[in-house]
Amino acid sequence: MDYIARFGLEFNPFLKNSKDIIVEDDEFQEVRFRLNYLAQTKGFGLLTGSPGLGKTTALRTFAASLNPSKYKVIYNSLSTVTVMDFYRSMAEGFDEFPSHRKTDNFRIIQEAINRLSIEKRITPIIIIDEANHISNGILNDLKILFNFEMDSRDRAVIILAGQPQLNNILSLAVHEPLRQRIVMNYHMEGLTKESGRIYIEKKLKGAGCKQKVFEEPAIEAILNASNGTPRLINKYCNSCLLIGHNDGLVTIDANTAMQAINDNQLG
């Protein structure tokens, strides 16, 4: 018997590469509401939060929910690209052949936005993830890139998502003009204790589990150690299953949870 079968699971719901089980707690729903609002109003949006709170999951879920006949999503992660790669990737996102010159890519991107917005009535949704890595140069460029002076209406949605230090970057006086254009600003705090319990329960249920896996003291220990961070909850729960299987347990107790937490914190 493997550890998945031992705990009545069809698969391990706490692994990153397992089947997606989206748990929509109150904060997740609030983020979705605000992103949908931004999609209607257009302009700049800001989504921040500590690592592991589910920003990227929320963004991908939002993007997947959009009608492709009305919206075109271009996703970029600043953690893995250079400045030039960023603009080339954005041009390619609009199905355009990128240039080796930034000024040419500016023109290509602006013309693509105009074609989509004016001719096809399609709103571009540009998601810039890991934006806490953004340079002052790119921020200044964004202000110019999406400043269509022909009329006062925004023609695209630009979402900057990243860790809390992104707010510190944007608070610099040099970025005041860009900050004034932000129409949606939300900071994710993480799961409450109640939401954390529901999160674990729905993860297990989504994996076909019909039996009790975690004892209440174990859940309490996991939630206290994770501080409401879904990524850490997943990490601790996964370790609990492995340790529990190795020890021949039927349910995960507090001692097993503490061992899993300590192993991960030391590792």
Where are these regions (language model features)?
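Walker A/P-loop nucleotide-binding motif
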Residues: 40-61
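Conserved alpha-helical scaffold flanking the Walker A/P-loop in AAA+ ATPase domains
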Residues: 34-37, 103-119
